[in-house]
């Protein structure tokens, strides 16, 4: 019952901002949190997941947000999949590099072959702070060269309408 009540509180928080719940986490729950300080190094996969969320948001909204730094992430790791709830700071070069607190949820599924899905990619709900740029920004070096190339052009909406 203790585990169920804890998971209900996590669900009510939407999976984000659950640090205050971790003191009451039952030992049987496979949930963790990680906050980053100015001197911490980011895990490469967390940076890629953060970029995935921003990229999805940019494609849907037609924006150009760019990853500035990762503030924290929570993870839930049951048996077959892992869910990562990432809170990050994105900058908007089209708005004088203003900073936006952003949230994304990426699910990693599979054992031998990984499938990634991103079903939350949004500015953090609530009041936005336009704070100064954090001293510790994302280091691009941990990202593999494979992921640094530009993306192909998005096909036009009528690209698949030909009936041949």
Swiss-Prot record:
InterPro entries the UniProt entry points to: MS5
Protein name: Uncharacterized protein At4g17700
């Amino acid at each position: 019952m203790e585990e169920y009540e804890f998971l209900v509180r996590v669900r009510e928080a939407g999976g984000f901002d659950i640090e205050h719940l971790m003191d009451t986490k039952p030992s049987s729950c496979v949930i963790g949190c990680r906050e980053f300080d100015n001197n911490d190094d980011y895990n490469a996969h967390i940076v890629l997941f953060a970029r995935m969320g921003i990229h999805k948001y940019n494609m849907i909204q037609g924006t150009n947000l760019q990853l500035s730094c990762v503030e924290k992430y929570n993870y839930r790791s049951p048996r077959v999949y892992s869910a990562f709830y990432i809170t990050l700071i994105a900058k908007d070069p089209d708005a004088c590099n203003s900073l936006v607190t952003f949230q994304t949820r990426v699910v990693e599924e599979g054992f031998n072959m990984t499938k990634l899905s991103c079903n939350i990619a949004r500015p953090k709900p609530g009041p936005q702070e336009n704070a100064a740029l954090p001293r510790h920004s994302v280091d691009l070096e941990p990202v593999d060269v494979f992921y640094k190339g530009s993306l192909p052009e998005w096909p036009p909406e009528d690209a698949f309408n030909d009936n041949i």
